[in-house]
A protein has these predicted regions:
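Acidic, PIN/NYN-like endoribonuclease modules and their adjacent C-terminal/linker elements
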Residues: 1, 112-143
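Short, well-structured N-terminal submotif of metal-dependent ribonuclease cores
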Residues: 1-39, 54-68
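Alpha-helix capping/helix-boundary segments
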Residues: 8, 43, 87-88, 110-111, ...
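Short, conserved active-site loop motifs that form the nucleotide-linked donor/cofactor pocket
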Residues: 35, 79-80, 136
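Short beta-strand segments at enzyme active-site cores
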Residues: 38-42, 125
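Active-site neighborhoods of divalent-metal-dependent phosphate/nucleic-acid chemistry enzymes
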Residues: 60, 78-122
Length: 143
């Protein structure tokens, strides 16, 4: 199963992004395919926060547009939501301790822990910060 990071979701949604064509095509490929693909809850939260933020985008996506986009992804038959469960904390704790993770990097550790807990084969991301988590395979689908 492939999970999709925040930046790829943002690129797929924001037509003004230079990476929109590739990002939209890749997410559409997952959404229209039969194979299960994953959306970590933190990535959806971050997506909403980023695309509706007026200091990041001018104009930002309207709330109804961002909510509609999330709804569309969640309505695909092959989408799986990655949420915290009983085994999440031990996994996150190990990642934090082993990688000496603190500060803002904790947000990436949360996503990594969710992916590892749910058996994700690869996280699609354009963010190199995930290399801090060697147990998580990352792929940049834009290159």
């Amino acid at each position: 199963m492939i999970a999709v990071d925040t930046n790829i979701l943002v690129y797929s949604h924001r037509r003004d992004s230079e990476f929109h064509p590739a990002g939209a095509a890749k997410v559409r490929e997952l959404a229209e395919g039969r194979a299960l693909w994953a959306l970590p809850w933190p990535c959806l939260h971050e997506f909403f926060s980023i695309v509706t933020h007026p200091r990041i985008y001018d104009p930002p996506s309207r709330v109804d547009q961002a909510l509609g986009q999330i709804d569309a992804w969640l309505e695909t038959a092959s989408a799986v939501l990655l949420a915290e469960g009983e085994t999440y904390w031990p996994r996150l704790r190990d990642l934090l301790a082993d990688g000496k993770i603190s500060g803002p990097a904790v947000h990436d550790a949360r996503i990594a822990a969710l992916c590892l807990t749910h058996g994700v084969q690869a996280l699609w991301t354009a963010d190199r910060d995930f290399t801090r988590f060697p147990r998580l395979r990352t792929v940049n689908p834009l290159i």
